[in-house]
Amino acid sequence: MEDATFNNQDKLPISSDDLVKLLNDCEIEFDLYSHKPLYTVKESKIFYESQYENNELNCHIKNLYLRDKKKNNYLFVFDQDKIIDLKQLNHLISATRLSFGSPQRLFENLGVFPGAVSPFCMLNGKKNGVKLFFDTSFKKTK
């Protein structure tokens, strides 16, 4: 299935093909799911309910690319149903004025376009100083 990221493989810091090769080279088992860009949790739920019987994936996430007043970049990974309060998140990480990063910064720092953000983006994000935060509720997930 083609999407914006697929059509721009040559512009990505690490292409999806290179990511698959890296996982295979590291002997990391994985299942590959291809889908159109999903911009909202609602879109994600509709897509997965229509594609996969019994909702076979046991952990559904939402990824938020945020930036603060000091121009620090963050990738937050939450359970898809968790309600996020950006003001509270500011206090939790001692940031000021968290807001969503622009599509241009998203591509520059994580190497993807909106609708294609995942924790794997940190392969690009780490070298660009993006800080990664996982919600602790994932400890309960397989």
Task: Report residues per predicted region.
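Extended, low-hydrophobicity, polar/charged segments
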Residues: 1-142
